[in-house]
Amino acid sequence: MQPFKVHSPYEPAGDQPQAIEKLAQSIQTQHRYQTLVGVTGSGKTYTMAKIIEKLQIPTLIMTHNKTLAAQLYSEFRGFFPKNHVEYFISHFDYYQPEAYIPRQDLFIEKDSSINEELERLRLSATTSLLAHEDVIVVASVSANYGLGSPAEYVQMIQKLEVGERLHQRELLLRLVEMGYKRNDNFFDRGDFRVNGEVIDIYPAYSEDEVVRVEFFGDEIERIALLDSVDRQALGELPSYILYAANQFIVGQNRLHEALKTIESELEERLAFYQKEGRMVEHARLKQRTEFDLEMIGATGICKGIENYSRHLTGKKVGETPYSLLDYFEFKGKPYLIIVDESHVSLPQFGGMYAGDRSRKEVLVEHGFRLPSALDNRPLTYEEFITKAPHYLFVSATPAPRELELSQAQIAEQIVRPTGLLDPLYEVRDSQNQVAALFDEIKAVVARGERVLITALTKKMAEELTKYYADLGIKVRYMHSEIDAIERNQIIRGLRTGEFDVLVGINLLREGLDLPEVSLVAILDADKEGFLRSETSLIQTMGRAARNLNGRVLLFAQKITPSMKRAMEVTDYRRSKQQEFNQKHGITPKSVTRKLDEELRLEGVGDLYAKASKKEKIPKAEREKIIKEMTKKMHEAAKLLDFEEAARLRDEIAKIRAL
């Protein structure tokens, strides 16, 4: 095991040393729950990293959205460059679950689009957990959704050794059993191809390496790694451990047993419908399930196979399904779950289960699914919160549930390493808020700084964006319908100065870490509700806490209880921060944060768009982009899409010139 070692030019400062010591000691003395109350800009992520370094145990870091998960993944890869830092979020670019609307007699088929790169990263995460000890996985709430059994996954491991006696046909059959597909023409991840006594395997979890196995008769003569794009040899290996192509793979024995139990459940359910005289549901369930059974028996898979997960994993009715947490538990060693922005993340867990259950109960009732489909579900809140040995809740505004669970194991991180104080705030009359804000925006932009504006409705945000754009302000609007990749690009555009003002509805949920922002404007701050609650106001005000000139304007007709409490919390924190600075002779300074490389989840066009915004790209980064685009160019040529191949060729030439 490679020890966890934080790589950073900084040492703990401000409130970080006492928070690190208290929380690490709490976990080491076997307390299950602890909370870090850390203000925006206090270096909570660095504190989390130092706690992991101190504990030396595998860690799952969970948060409530993909944007924040991507940001954390980038930061932790920087902190732990020599350890296995993995990324686990939903692999769907688009997902429409199957559903039935009885009053309209309308059945909606499941429809989805899987992002291959996200799928690779998910496989890489589970593979690392089984193969290594020094693993950190950054995940969204997808970590709570069902996966295949880790025990079955381990059974599917194939070790290859030079000199091993193994018939080529045996290996080919084993690869098929492991979920790999033969493809001698369009070779991609999860495929293998055969050329005489040479088998090339592209592991489903590999970023850019192909495994070549060369036989001499019934003996493995050579194992080598090849570059996936140019097929150049990267080196020879004495052995190689190959993992399955997906997390839902099961062995033949388990599969045959599952077919029997599915048939048994089907017979029982059909008898129920027969007794009730519900022949429409009887016919529907019989036709759908028998078709699925035939497909599973012939190919090992069917559309919607996850609905049979209870049978495929051997779980009992109502038993907790397998999830990513079981891969952490598999080796029987302690691990830590860090829940970032816990005041938002934890409530999602209960909501996920309730929504999933409600939809599937309708499907089961009307004969679209067997009752066992109800066990293909995310973890409940209670299951999640009692599964791991140690939890660390992290938030600037933890909810009562986190504080109650943690009891005395709570550390405050109010003093920032930079000495920055919580931003000054000012309450302004909201009667003429748009015009008044325009003057403030001009002054901030003239200093080369940025502005965040939060509105109450989508319509208002859109109109505000158009209004300021017509007045010559470089402004963009960010809303919930924008996907994670575009959201990251918008945030980067704000930081680089592509535009100066970002308008949103609930920007506090976007995981924004923007040192360039010196003004946060909260429109209609006196409209009590979720978007203007005490927690939301504190979180939003904190977006201005990374800049020395940080200010918050609260536009309102009156001061609400939520506003009053948020301002009191801000005053308390400023007082404590000022006292610490005076005592230690600290002069506040703005946060400096590099424009880190974004998580590479884009298509080729996005890669070029990202590259073209940089004046100078590091050589390693440039070569990585070129390699990915070259691969896409070759794929386009194979598909006879020469126009696309030519476009990619031209873009590669442009990137080489940057």
From Swiss-Prot:
One of its GO terms (molecular function) is ATP hydrolysis activity. One of its GO terms (biological process) is nucleotide-excision repair. PROSITE patterns: HELICASE_ATP_BIND_1, HELICASE_CTER, UVR. Residues 436-595 form the Helicase C-terminal domain. Residues 623-658 form the UVR domain. HAMAP family: UvrB. The UvrABC repair system catalyzes the recognition and processing of DNA lesions. A damage recognition complex composed of 2 UvrA and 2 UvrB subunits scans DNA for abnormalities. Upon binding of the UvrA(2)B(2) complex to a putative damaged site, the DNA wraps around one UvrB monomer. DNA wrap is dependent on ATP binding by UvrB and probably causes local melting of the DNA helix, facilitating insertion of UvrB beta-hairpin between the DNA strands. Then UvrB probes one DNA strand for the presence of a lesion. This is UvrABC system protein B. It comes from Wolinella succinogenes (strain ATCC 29543 / DSM 1740 / CCUG 13145 / JCM 31913 / LMG 7466 / NCTC 11488 / FDC 602W) (Vibrio succinogenes). The gene is uvrB.
